[in-house]
Amino acid sequence: MINPTTITNYDRNQRELEEFLMFCIMVAGKSAKQTAQKLNLFLSKRENNESPLEYVDALLHEELGINLEQAMRNVRLGQYGRLKKAFAGILRFQGHLHEVSVEDLESINGIGPKTARFYLLHSRQNVRHAVLDTHILKWLKLHGENAPKSTPTGKKYAMLEQAFLTYAWKYEMNPADLDLHIWKQYSQK
């Protein structure tokens, strides 16, 4: 099960990477703790020691007497259309999640810059990205950056990402540690 307070783990195996990527997709705009619990409940229905993506694939092909959307509704995951498209899309990375890039992930319907960077930042060592969620944006604004309230795109994302990485360097922290530190600080409020 995903533990949001210790999200960074560079030693995940393939099954753990599958679960973590599903969590990254699901958590957008939701409570991390609640999302982790719902994902755990969803995956607890697996049979025969299936990996998370093997389970999704079986549900998509209705091999278990239930389809993916029904299984998601049974545990109230929400955002059914978006999650179904994203989960189906990530099947192409099965067995290769150690190698995917931001661009690979962003090519999936339902995965944007924030989700792609979140996955990579907290699953691979020495990755230099910023997850510009509301917590990071508030923190950047507090530090004098012209940060909007919601996640920007394009050049604005790139500019704020660089600002965040500069602060990480200044504070002698890797970006994943600074991200988690800020998230813990702001998510408690």
Language model regions located:
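Structure-specific DNA junction-binding interface
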Residues: 1-69
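Generic structural signal for hydrophobic core residues of well-folded globular domains
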Residues: 25, 29-30, 42, 46, ...
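C-terminal accessory module of base-excision DNA glycosylases/AP lyases that mediates lesion recognition
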Residues: 1-15, 19, 80-91, 98-100, ...
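Alpha-helical ds-nucleic-acid-binding substructure associated with the helix-hairpin-helix region
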Residues: 39-109
